Amino acid sequence: MIEYTIRDGFPKFQDLPWDYSLTNWPGLTDRLEEVQRGISRHPVVFVNYEGSLYAIKELPTGVALSEYQMLLKMQEQHLPCVEPVGYVQISTGNCQRSAIITSYLDLSLPYRSLFMHSNLGRYRDHLLDAIAGLLVQLHLAGFFWGDCSFSNTLFRRDAGALQAYLVDAETTEHHACPLSPMLRNHDLEIMQANIQRDVF
């Protein structure tokens, strides 16, 4: 059984091979696109509908719903994050899983691109400022990220600087705003550990 929850104004995504894990989609649909991507702990694919790209991430059952709801709350507060499109619950035989669908963030770059391409080197010094600025915005709005890292962020160039966008809200929680000092400090500790891992 496959259950779709998709926002109005977007494709229905019902022609995709949901009976199979995303890792098996190559060769099963001609909608797949290759784009620059960061590192993800879960399978991720990009699909093309009439020139618009969408990211699909496979998750354990139920997780896509919670991430979708968090992204909706962030979007309602005009926070910089990817646009949530919908989620899918899949139950095939003994296998249960879910998937979240988001709009592809045009003109964005994963942090590794800023290290791999010499012509983008001038932006590297702005990475920390950009992700720290994103974290401050989230905390002021009452969001605890729980997994702040370069890998869970995309960047857009903005007048010589960078704007950071949250792309992974699996561990995000919404609390009273502004966030408590204890949770803010915990998020900062997680960010420090994750960034050291990302870079080194």
Language-model segments: what does each one mean?
Residues M1-D19:
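N-terminal presequences and immediately downstream first alpha-helices
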Residues L59, D158, P178:
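Surface loops and adjacent helix of pleckstrin homology
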Residues F155-A161:
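Activation-loop N-terminal segment of eukaryotic-like protein kinases
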